[in-house]
Amino acid sequence: MLITNIETIPGKNIVKHLGLVQGSTVRSKHVGRDIMAGLKNIFGGELRGYTELLEDARGEALERMKRQARGMGANAVINVRFATSSVAQGAAELFVYGTAVVME
């Protein structure tokens, strides 16, 4: 399945717009990661634990969106966007959405 953040694909024709599709996941922080993040905030550096957490969350949300698009008969999702929000103390939602289409 083709996933893109642009509205058109050069050389491809959109033959049908199927509508909005989305995927999301809510993740919470790990106490051990919080301790390491606190130290990194003092000394500087990448928060690798959080980087991995967000990479996993993006992948899961994207797979959920693709599954919804396939269920609608799409072979592509265009104009894809990611968003994050805090849903509770220590927990965040990663949300991805786009337009399911049939391309040829």
Curated annotation (Swiss-Prot):
Domain of life, source organism: Bacteria
Coiled coil: none
Signal peptide segment: none
Pfam families assigned: YbjQ_1
Family: Belongs to the UPF0145 family.
PANTHER family in the record: UPF0145 PROTEIN SCO3412, UPF0145 PROTEIN YBJQ
Name used for this protein in its record: UPF0145 protein HCH_01985
